[in-house]
Amino acid sequence: MAGADPPLPAQLLTQSTVPVIVGPTGIGKSQVAFELARRLGGEIVVADSRQVYERLDIATNKPSAEQRGEVRYHMIDFVDPATTFNAAQYVEGARSAIDDIIDRGKVPIVEGGTMLYVDALCDGFTLTGIPPDPALRAQLERLDATRLRERLLAQDADPGVDLHNPVRMIRAIEILEAAGPPLRRLRTRTPPPWTPVRMGLVASLEVIDRRLAERSRRQVERGLIAETQAALDSGVPENAPVLTGIGYAEAVAHIRGELILEELPHAMARSNRRYARRQLRWWRRDARIRWFEIEPDPLPGILNYLE
Protein backbone atom coordinates (compact mmCIF):
# COMPACT_ATOMS: atom_id res chain seq x y z
CA MET A 1 0.00 0.00 0.00
CA ALA A 2 2.92 2.32 0.65
CA GLY A 3 4.37 4.37 -2.17
CA ALA A 4 5.81 7.70 -3.20
CA ASP A 5 2.73 9.04 -4.97
CA PRO A 6 2.35 12.83 -4.83
CA PRO A 7 -0.50 14.25 -2.75
CA LEU A 8 -3.82 14.58 -4.54
CA PRO A 9 -5.59 17.95 -4.77
CA ALA A 10 -7.66 18.66 -1.68
CA GLN A 11 -11.04 18.91 -3.43
CA LEU A 12 -12.71 17.62 -0.26
CA LEU A 13 -12.22 20.94 1.52
CA THR A 14 -14.36 22.89 -0.91
CA GLN A 15 -17.16 20.40 -0.40
CA SER A 16 -17.02 20.63 3.43
CA THR A 17 -16.73 16.86 3.66
CA VAL A 18 -14.59 14.79 6.00
CA PRO A 19 -13.52 11.18 5.24
CA VAL A 20 -14.36 8.83 8.12
CA ILE A 21 -12.80 5.35 8.21
CA VAL A 22 -14.37 2.73 10.47
CA GLY A 23 -14.23 -1.03 10.81
CA PRO A 24 -13.60 -3.83 13.29
CA THR A 25 -10.53 -3.92 15.47
CA GLY A 26 -7.47 -5.38 13.76
CA ILE A 27 -8.77 -4.82 10.22
CA GLY A 28 -6.08 -2.29 9.29
CA LYS A 29 -7.85 1.06 9.66
CA SER A 30 -4.75 2.86 10.91
CA GLN A 31 -2.61 1.90 7.93
CA VAL A 32 -5.31 2.80 5.41
CA ALA A 33 -5.89 6.17 7.09
CA PHE A 34 -2.14 6.82 7.08
CA GLU A 35 -1.86 6.11 3.36
CA LEU A 36 -4.94 8.20 2.62
CA ALA A 37 -3.52 11.11 4.61
CA ARG A 38 -0.28 10.90 2.62
CA ARG A 39 -2.18 10.99 -0.66
CA LEU A 40 -4.54 13.81 0.34
CA GLY A 41 -2.05 15.87 2.31
CA GLY A 42 -4.28 15.28 5.32
CA GLU A 43 -4.10 14.92 9.08
CA ILE A 44 -5.67 12.12 11.11
CA VAL A 45 -8.17 12.61 13.92
CA VAL A 46 -8.22 9.34 15.86
CA ALA A 47 -11.54 8.14 17.31
CA ASP A 48 -10.34 5.62 19.87
CA SER A 49 -11.27 5.72 23.55
CA ARG A 50 -7.93 4.22 24.64
CA GLN A 51 -5.46 5.97 22.36
CA VAL A 52 -6.23 9.22 24.18
CA TYR A 53 -4.21 7.94 27.16
CA GLU A 54 -0.53 8.70 27.53
CA ARG A 55 2.25 6.09 27.74
CA LEU A 56 0.14 3.01 27.05
CA ASP A 57 0.93 2.32 23.41
CA ILE A 58 1.06 -1.42 22.71
CA ALA A 59 -2.45 -2.77 23.31
CA THR A 60 -3.98 0.54 22.23
CA ASN A 61 -2.36 0.08 18.80
CA LYS A 62 -1.15 3.65 18.49
CA PRO A 63 0.52 4.78 15.25
CA SER A 64 4.26 4.20 15.04
CA ALA A 65 6.86 6.92 15.55
CA GLU A 66 7.59 6.75 11.82
CA GLN A 67 3.94 7.35 10.94
CA ARG A 68 3.69 10.23 13.39
CA GLY A 69 6.80 11.74 11.86
CA GLU A 70 5.20 11.78 8.43
CA VAL A 71 1.53 12.52 9.20
CA ARG A 72 0.13 14.67 12.00
CA TYR A 73 -2.21 12.90 14.43
CA HIS A 74 -4.80 14.40 16.76
CA MET A 75 -6.64 13.09 19.84
CA ILE A 76 -3.94 10.68 21.00
CA ASP A 77 -1.50 10.75 23.93
CA PHE A 78 -2.90 13.62 26.00
CA VAL A 79 -4.88 12.12 28.91
CA ASP A 80 -3.38 10.85 32.18
CA PRO A 81 -4.13 7.08 32.27
CA ALA A 82 -5.06 7.30 35.95
CA THR A 83 -8.03 9.52 35.05
CA THR A 84 -11.24 9.08 33.08
CA PHE A 85 -12.22 10.61 29.74
CA ASN A 86 -15.70 10.58 28.23
CA ALA A 87 -17.28 10.91 24.83
CA ALA A 88 -18.39 14.50 25.37
CA GLN A 89 -14.79 15.53 26.02
CA TYR A 90 -13.74 13.61 22.93
CA VAL A 91 -16.28 15.29 20.66
CA GLU A 92 -15.31 18.74 21.90
CA GLY A 93 -11.61 18.09 21.25
CA ALA A 94 -12.09 16.30 17.93
CA ARG A 95 -14.41 18.94 16.46
CA SER A 96 -11.94 21.64 17.49
CA ALA A 97 -9.12 19.70 15.82
CA ILE A 98 -11.13 19.24 12.61
CA ASP A 99 -11.96 22.95 12.47
CA ASP A 100 -8.28 23.79 12.92
CA ILE A 101 -7.18 21.35 10.21
CA ILE A 102 -9.66 22.80 7.73
CA ASP A 103 -8.66 26.37 8.64
CA ARG A 104 -5.06 25.48 7.80
CA GLY A 105 -6.03 24.16 4.37
CA LYS A 106 -5.55 20.48 5.19
CA VAL A 107 -7.89 17.50 4.93
CA PRO A 108 -9.08 16.01 8.24
CA ILE A 109 -9.44 12.22 8.18
CA VAL A 110 -11.31 10.58 11.05
CA GLU A 111 -10.20 7.03 11.83
CA GLY A 112 -11.17 4.78 14.68
CA GLY A 113 -13.11 1.92 16.13
CA THR A 114 -14.83 3.37 19.20
CA MET A 115 -18.43 3.26 18.06
CA LEU A 116 -19.78 5.91 20.42
CA TYR A 117 -16.97 8.35 19.60
CA VAL A 118 -17.47 8.06 15.84
CA ASP A 119 -21.24 8.33 15.96
CA ALA A 120 -21.25 11.22 18.44
CA LEU A 121 -18.64 13.10 16.43
CA CYS A 122 -20.41 12.65 13.09
CA ASP A 123 -24.07 12.83 14.13
CA GLY A 124 -24.16 14.56 17.49
CA PHE A 125 -25.20 12.83 20.70
CA THR A 126 -28.46 10.98 21.07
CA LEU A 127 -29.71 8.96 24.02
CA THR A 128 -30.40 5.93 21.84
CA GLY A 129 -27.00 6.15 20.17
CA ILE A 130 -25.15 5.16 23.34
CA PRO A 131 -24.78 1.37 23.47
CA PRO A 132 -25.49 -0.66 26.62
CA ASP A 133 -22.67 -1.49 29.02
CA PRO A 134 -23.41 -5.01 30.36
CA ALA A 135 -20.67 -4.93 33.01
CA LEU A 136 -21.85 -1.59 34.42
CA ARG A 137 -25.48 -2.71 34.35
CA ALA A 138 -24.64 -5.84 36.31
CA GLN A 139 -22.91 -3.69 38.94
CA LEU A 140 -25.78 -1.19 39.15
CA GLU A 141 -28.47 -3.85 39.37
CA ARG A 142 -27.03 -4.86 42.74
CA LEU A 143 -27.86 -1.41 44.17
CA ASP A 144 -31.21 -0.50 45.71
CA ALA A 145 -33.25 2.48 44.50
CA THR A 146 -31.86 4.83 47.16
CA ARG A 147 -28.24 4.17 46.25
CA LEU A 148 -29.02 4.38 42.53
CA ARG A 149 -30.69 7.75 43.09
CA GLU A 150 -27.69 9.02 45.09
CA ARG A 151 -25.25 7.92 42.39
CA LEU A 152 -27.34 9.43 39.59
CA LEU A 153 -27.82 12.79 41.30
CA ALA A 154 -24.12 12.98 42.14
CA GLN A 155 -23.45 12.94 38.38
CA ASP A 156 -26.38 15.09 37.22
CA ALA A 157 -28.46 17.18 39.62
CA ASP A 158 -31.32 17.42 37.10
CA PRO A 159 -31.33 14.20 35.04
CA GLY A 160 -34.98 14.47 34.01
CA VAL A 161 -35.79 10.80 34.66
CA ASP A 162 -38.11 9.03 37.11
CA LEU A 163 -36.09 8.85 40.34
CA HIS A 164 -38.28 6.00 41.61
CA ASN A 165 -37.71 3.76 38.58
CA PRO A 166 -34.51 1.67 38.91
CA VAL A 167 -34.50 0.70 35.22
CA ARG A 168 -34.62 4.35 34.10
CA MET A 169 -31.99 5.36 36.65
CA ILE A 170 -29.63 2.57 35.57
CA ARG A 171 -29.92 3.62 31.93
CA ALA A 172 -29.33 7.27 32.86
CA ILE A 173 -26.18 6.38 34.82
CA GLU A 174 -25.01 4.22 31.92
CA ILE A 175 -25.38 7.16 29.52
CA LEU A 176 -23.70 9.61 31.90
CA GLU A 177 -20.73 7.29 32.39
CA ALA A 178 -20.22 7.14 28.62
CA ALA A 179 -21.06 10.67 27.52
CA GLY A 180 -20.78 12.87 30.59
CA PRO A 181 -23.38 15.24 32.06
CA PRO A 182 -25.84 16.80 31.62
CA LEU A 183 -28.38 14.39 30.20
CA ARG A 184 -30.49 17.21 28.74
CA ARG A 185 -27.65 17.94 26.28
CA LEU A 186 -28.21 14.55 24.71
CA ARG A 187 -31.88 15.20 24.02
CA THR A 188 -31.01 17.71 21.30
CA ARG A 189 -28.78 16.41 18.53
CA THR A 190 -26.11 18.89 17.36
CA PRO A 191 -24.49 17.68 14.12
CA PRO A 192 -21.15 19.09 12.97
CA PRO A 193 -20.84 21.87 10.36
CA TRP A 194 -19.19 19.44 7.91
CA THR A 195 -20.46 16.33 6.14
CA PRO A 196 -18.91 12.97 7.07
CA VAL A 197 -18.10 10.57 4.21
CA ARG A 198 -18.32 7.22 5.95
CA MET A 199 -16.19 4.36 4.68
CA GLY A 200 -15.86 0.95 6.31
CA LEU A 201 -13.17 -1.69 5.99
CA VAL A 202 -14.28 -5.30 6.00
CA ALA A 203 -12.99 -8.83 5.48
CA SER A 204 -14.17 -12.36 6.12
CA LEU A 205 -14.31 -13.41 9.77
CA GLU A 206 -11.53 -15.88 9.02
CA VAL A 207 -9.24 -13.07 7.84
CA ILE A 208 -10.18 -10.84 10.79
CA ASP A 209 -9.58 -13.64 13.30
CA ARG A 210 -6.19 -14.44 11.76
CA ARG A 211 -5.13 -10.80 11.93
CA LEU A 212 -6.26 -10.54 15.55
CA ALA A 213 -4.33 -13.66 16.57
CA GLU A 214 -1.18 -12.35 14.90
CA ARG A 215 -1.57 -8.92 16.46
CA SER A 216 -2.10 -10.34 19.95
CA ARG A 217 1.05 -12.42 19.66
CA ARG A 218 3.07 -9.41 18.44
CA GLN A 219 1.79 -7.25 21.28
CA VAL A 220 3.00 -9.72 23.89
CA GLU A 221 6.36 -9.99 22.12
CA ARG A 222 6.70 -6.18 22.00
CA GLY A 223 6.52 -5.91 25.77
CA LEU A 224 2.86 -5.67 26.76
CA ILE A 225 3.47 -7.15 30.20
CA ALA A 226 6.30 -4.73 31.00
CA GLU A 227 4.25 -1.77 29.77
CA THR A 228 1.31 -2.83 31.94
CA GLN A 229 3.52 -3.36 34.98
CA ALA A 230 5.10 0.07 34.48
CA ALA A 231 1.64 1.66 34.43
CA LEU A 232 0.68 -0.11 37.65
CA ASP A 233 3.97 0.87 39.28
CA SER A 234 3.37 4.52 38.34
CA GLY A 235 0.07 4.55 40.21
CA VAL A 236 -2.45 3.76 37.48
CA PRO A 237 -5.12 1.67 39.27
CA GLU A 238 -6.12 -1.74 37.93
CA ASN A 239 -9.68 -0.51 37.43
CA ALA A 240 -8.66 2.54 35.37
CA PRO A 241 -10.57 2.54 32.06
CA VAL A 242 -7.48 1.98 29.94
CA LEU A 243 -6.33 -1.02 32.01
CA THR A 244 -9.72 -2.70 31.89
CA GLY A 245 -9.67 -2.70 28.08
CA ILE A 246 -8.66 -5.62 25.88
CA GLY A 247 -5.00 -6.52 26.14
CA TYR A 248 -4.26 -4.70 29.37
CA ALA A 249 -7.00 -6.53 31.29
CA GLU A 250 -5.47 -9.86 30.28
CA ALA A 251 -1.97 -8.59 31.07
CA VAL A 252 -3.14 -7.52 34.55
CA ALA A 253 -4.61 -11.00 35.05
CA HIS A 254 -1.24 -12.50 34.09
CA ILE A 255 0.61 -10.20 36.50
CA ARG A 256 -1.77 -11.29 39.27
CA GLY A 257 -0.97 -14.92 38.51
CA GLU A 258 -4.43 -15.64 37.13
CA LEU A 259 -3.37 -16.27 33.52
CA ILE A 260 -0.29 -18.14 32.34
CA LEU A 261 1.96 -16.54 29.73
CA GLU A 262 1.21 -19.15 27.07
CA GLU A 263 -2.51 -18.42 27.34
CA LEU A 264 -2.17 -14.61 27.34
CA PRO A 265 -2.24 -13.96 23.55
CA HIS A 266 -5.06 -16.47 23.08
CA ALA A 267 -7.17 -14.76 25.75
CA MET A 268 -6.50 -11.39 24.11
CA ALA A 269 -7.49 -12.74 20.69
CA ARG A 270 -10.74 -14.17 22.07
CA SER A 271 -11.70 -10.84 23.61
CA ASN A 272 -10.82 -9.04 20.40
CA ARG A 273 -12.89 -11.45 18.31
CA ARG A 274 -15.96 -10.73 20.43
CA TYR A 275 -15.37 -7.00 20.18
CA ALA A 276 -14.82 -7.12 16.40
CA ARG A 277 -18.15 -8.88 15.90
CA ARG A 278 -19.91 -6.31 18.09
CA GLN A 279 -18.38 -3.50 16.02
CA LEU A 280 -19.50 -5.14 12.78
CA ARG A 281 -23.07 -5.55 14.04
CA TRP A 282 -23.13 -1.92 15.14
CA TRP A 283 -21.89 -0.43 11.88
CA ARG A 284 -23.72 -2.72 9.50
CA ARG A 285 -26.95 -1.08 10.61
CA ASP A 286 -25.70 2.23 9.12
CA ALA A 287 -26.64 2.36 5.44
CA ARG A 288 -24.51 5.48 4.97
CA ILE A 289 -21.27 3.49 5.19
CA ARG A 290 -19.60 2.47 1.93
CA TRP A 291 -17.71 -0.80 2.52
CA PHE A 292 -14.32 -1.75 1.07
CA GLU A 293 -12.57 -5.12 1.28
CA ILE A 294 -9.26 -4.82 3.10
CA GLU A 295 -7.56 -7.33 0.79
CA PRO A 296 -5.77 -6.94 -1.49
CA ASP A 297 -5.76 -3.11 -1.16
CA PRO A 298 -8.75 -0.84 -0.44
CA LEU A 299 -6.94 2.45 -1.11
CA PRO A 300 -7.56 2.72 -4.89
CA GLY A 301 -11.28 2.16 -4.39
CA ILE A 302 -11.42 4.67 -1.55
CA LEU A 303 -9.61 7.33 -3.58
CA ASN A 304 -11.93 6.74 -6.52
CA TYR A 305 -14.97 6.98 -4.23
CA LEU A 306 -13.77 10.26 -2.73
CA GLU A 307 -13.04 11.83 -6.10
Question: At which residue positions do the language-model features occur?
Answer:
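Phosphate/pyrophosphate-binding catalytic cores of soluble transferases and nucleic-acid-acting enzymes
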Residues: 1-307
